[in-house]
Amino acid sequence: MEQIQMVKVLEKCQVTPPSDTTDVELSLPVTFFDIPWLHLNKMQSLLFYDFPYPRTHFLDTVIPNLKASLSLTLKHYVPLSGNLLMPIKSGEMPKFQYSRDEGDSITLIVAESDQDFDYLKGHQLVDSNDLHGLFYVMPRVIRTMQDYKVIPLVAVQVTVFPNRGIAVALTAHHSIADAKSFVMFINAWAYINKFGKDADLLSANLLPSFDRSIIKDLYGLEETFWNEMQDVLEMFSRFGSKPPRFNKVRATYVLSLAEIQKLKNKVLNLRGSEPTIRVTTFTMTCGYVWTCMVKSKDDVVSEESSNDENELEYFSFTADCRGLLTPPCPPNYFGNCLASCVAKATHKELVGDKGLLVAVAAIGEAIEKRLHNEKGVLADAKTWLSESNGIPSKRFLGITGSPKFDSYGVDFGWGKPAKFDITSVDYAELIYVIQSRDFEKGVEIGVSLPKIHMDAFAKIFEEGFCSLS
């Protein structure tokens, strides 16, 4: 059978919605919220579960149940079985389309690995390539149809580590969903697999709404975003679908509530009589990681390429704005509904004695500017793409995930995950932040860096906390 690094593929199959699904054909328009993500086909989540059972039990029981529950989940998430249709000719807009007659489905890979399960799920340094071997490489284009390129939306790989564990690796095209929506889909699949039925999805808040009419384009953003994305889409259309290779390692850092409070106390002491700033778990965590990252870069660059202390550094993140639209979007709206936020501060400020205060204040200010704009969250949205595109990559750090997501609540019937990972961060200068598995109100921070940079980051991260003791 096919080999992907140290993973043996046992089966490749297509999973469709059940035959009694009402929607035989379904088409959804792309909204202006979706357009900035049309080039990103790798939103990846990786869940590890302890599962001390033999390979035979996995193949005879687990896989049939997962196939059946995934199919039943797709009855309620039909568009995920379909594709993104990207126009070949100008003048047309992309759209999402599902057709039973075309055989639209989700690819499911069943695999086996002899890798060290404890190593892969650990918080210590892990070679990024070892994790990506657990993902099916979803093709960028599967066929052309009339005047459209047909691009798949979701793929799943389930890998067994006999007598040790299971890894569930999900890949989604970002254009169909933001992280909040995709986590809802994963939870719905896990819920149905655990309980064997879909009757209670509504009461579990896992029934999605695909009603695109909710999104009102009051500022002509569709045209603006579509025009600004053309060069990006052209560049990404030339990329292939080969398995990625990274010169990076991964590490997970955990902050307990007590450690977060220590950071908050430091900021409050530094603030003194300065105006009130937003001191939350999110701003504290991101502010601390941002300052550590900027300082660690100084440790690994040569003197000749040292940083200009007056240059700006940028921290980019997105915020769910479903409840801030006019009219508000329901919490179960399935799609992208994200506002772009960018914090900025000079290099000198971030590495200085008050660097943490500066970082937290800048992130809080970006949140206030975007989400609490008196004119509305979309009032200045026409500048979002140009603002982000103008950021130098060496001055950029972004974040995905959220400490609000209950990532460790995804229970397929095997208990909560031993580890939840977001491997998409390997593709850019990104970190992720999610709820901690083991500490109530704590967080986990996933970092992906070249080894020499990771060593410098880890040293600064740990020393920062030692200074708080």
From Swiss-Prot:
Keyword flag DNA repair:
no
Q: What is its EC number?
A: 2.3.1.153
Gene3D superfamilies, alphabetized: Chloramphenicol acetyltransferase-like domain (3.30.559.10)
- Keywords (A to Z) from UniProt: Acyltransferase, Cytoplasm, Transferase
Task: Specify whether Transferase is a keyword of the entry.
Answer: yes
Q: Where, per UniProt, does this protein localize?
A: Cytoplasm
The chemistry this enzyme catalyses reads:
an anthocyanidin 3,5-di-O-beta-D-glucoside + (E)-4-coumaroyl-CoA = an anthocyanidin 3-O-beta-D-glucoside 5-O-beta-D-[(6-O-(E)-4-coumaroyl)glucoside] + CoA
Q: Which GO terms describe its cellular component?
A: cytoplasm
Domain of life, per lineage:
Eukaryota
Mainly localized where?
cytoplasm
Q: In which tissues is it expressed?
A: Expressed in the outer epidermal cells of petals, but not in sepals, leaves or stems.
Q: What the entry says about post-translational processing? A: The N-terminus is blocked.
Q: What is the active site of this protein? A: 174, 411
A matching Pfam family: Transferase
Q: What regulates this protein's activity?
A: Activity enhanced by manganese ions and inhibited by p-chloromercuribenzoate.
Gene Ontology molecular function: any one? anthocyanin 5-(6'''-hydroxycinnamoyltransferase) activity
Report further notes.
Answer: Cannot use malonyl-CoA as a donor.
The entry assigns this protein to a family as follows:
Belongs to the plant acyltransferase family.
Q: Its function?
A: Transfers hydroxycinnamic moieties to the glucosyl groups of anthocyanin.
Q: What is this protein called?
A: Anthocyanin 5-aromatic acyltransferase
In its UniProt entry, the species of origin is given as: Gentiana triflora (Clustered gentian)
